[in-house]
Each structure stands twice: as C-alpha cells, then as structure tokens.
Curated annotation (Swiss-Prot):
Substrate binds at T16, A17, S18, G19, K20, S21. This is tRNA dimethylallyltransferase. The record marks T105, R127 as: Interaction with substrate tRNA. It comes from Xylella fastidiosa (strain 9a5c). Keywords: ATP-binding, Magnesium, Nucleotide-binding, Transferase, tRNA processing. Residues 39-42, 163-167 are annotated as: Interaction with substrate tRNA. Belongs to the IPP transferase family. The keyword Membrane does not apply. Catalyzes the transfer of a dimethylallyl group onto the adenine at position 37 in tRNAs that read codons beginning with uridine, leading to the formation of N6-(dimethylallyl)adenosine (i(6)A). Gene3D superfamilies: 1.10.20.140, P-loop containing nucleotide triphosphate hydrolases. It holds the Pfam family IPPT. Monomer.
Amino acid sequence: MPADTRPAAIVLMGPTASGKSQLAIDIAKRWGGEVISVDSVLVYRGLDIGTAKPNAAMRASVPHHLIDICEPWETYSAADFAHDARAAIDMIVRRGALPILTGGTGLYFRALLAGLSDMPPAHPEIRAMITAEAKRDSWATLHTRLAEVDAITAARIHATDPQRIQRALEVYRVSGRSMSDWQKQPLKQRLPLRVLKLVLAPTHRKVLHFRIAQRFKAMLDNGLLAEVNALRTHPSIHAMARPLNLPAMRAVGYRQCWEHLDNMYTAETLYQRGVAATRQLAKRQLTWLRGELDALWFDPEHDQSRIEKVVEAFLNR
C-alpha cells in the first residue's frame, strides 16, 4: 500500500470549557504547529472575555489564525470560514508547519473537512421578514412552520436555535427548495489532508458543569458586563433596530449580559442563565461530537500523556 503523502493536520474538538485552547498550544509548541480557530464567535473583534479568547501571551507563543477577523456587526458564514481556513492551511503547510484546527463549532468543521453543498446566499430582506415574524409569533412557532416545509431539517434543529431556523427558512423562501434538498447535491471538494481527530471532553458531565460555572463566574469577575456594555453602545451596533439579532450578540453569555443591562433580571439570575445557556451549548456540542465516529476521545485532566503518544504515532506514520 503506497504511503499517504498528504499533509498532516490535527483536529482538536470538544465542548466549551474543556481546555482545547491550551492543549492546541501545547501540541503546536511540541510539534511545530500553528493554531487555526474553528469558532464562530472568536472571529469577532471585541468579544474577548465572554469567549475565553486566547490572550496576547498565548497568541504570541504560537501563531493563531481566524481570530479577530471581522466586526461584531458583520456576518461571517460557514462558507466564509471554509474559504479562509483553506487559505490558512495552505500557508501553514507551505511553511512546513503543522495545522492544528481547534474549536467547538461543528458546522465550521463540517464545512471545511467534508465540504458544503451550494446554497442560496443570505438574503437581507427575507431574513428581516423572518426575524419580524419570530418577534411576533416566536421562534418555536417558526420551527413548526419549518417542519411543515422541511421536516428533515427541522428534526435536526432545536426549537431554541434561532440562527439555524432562520437560515433554513431563508433558503426555502429564497429558492423554493428545502435545505435538506439542497444538501443532497454533491459536496464541494474535500480538504486534501491526512487528519487526526481528537475530542477533549471530561469523562463525567458534572466535571464539565463545574468548569462551566467556574469559568462564567470568572468572566463576570473579569469584566464581561463592561465588555458587553461597550459593544451595545458602539455606534454601529447602537444604531441597529434589532442588535440582539446579530450572530455575535446571540453568543452564549453576551445575550444574557445584554438582557441584564436592560434590567430584565438581577445579577444572580444573570449568572444562573449564563451557566444554563453554556451548559445547553455544551450538550449540543457533545451530541454532535458523538457522531464523529472516527474521533478519539480524551479526558482533559487525565489523558495528557496518551494524547502525546497518539499525536506522535500519527505524525510518524
């Protein structure tokens, strides 16, 4: 059997608060790598504390890519990510370094590693109509309407996931075809890499829940509310009719802080809601990760030496 001459890449996935960022840096330092963020919120400038964005020292220790590349009032799609990540990978490989892709945004990983079907681009007018509909009738109602025209996609989307409900309805209303129908088309070219997939996740869920609660408290202590207030008073965001519909402002933690600043609930309720929303995000991420059948799972607190051995063996193949 001929040797696989494709460039190697490490894919490090996991739920939020599992310790991926530091492990990615450790791997990069040991094996001459560069980190590519696979996170739909880290792309935004100004969202630092609430995203646990790698700090300046971490980013100076090894090169990082696709962090702070757009403004929080802009949109950034999975297709945008796949394009930019391919460019970053090409650059890293040309330098003779190891691409290390790390994050928790499953759609971004799928877009890059498996490819995307061609679909209609975003349509601002249709999107605004859907948003107005949701404000009037609720996202749960729109989820029901989606099920009437695209039962397959609706079954994959939770009724509390407005961004995906909106996109699925937008695709249908723009094209007259369901998203599931579009997804039956041949995928765009897959990434020509030899990939090792690792999942970093605590073995016991209560450990992850503890880490989530501890981290959200630290975010609040470190100034998350001030960060959100700076975002909401920025002229480009403040001038918007519905700023909370921005993908950046729908991010876990940011929406809850915004609502607290609007006096919708107390500081204690903010903490409780922020932790609950983060736990729900982690649950969705774990559901997706269980479908990654070719990934190897590791516990962040006990498996450091095992991870090193697996990476070493993969790179020496």
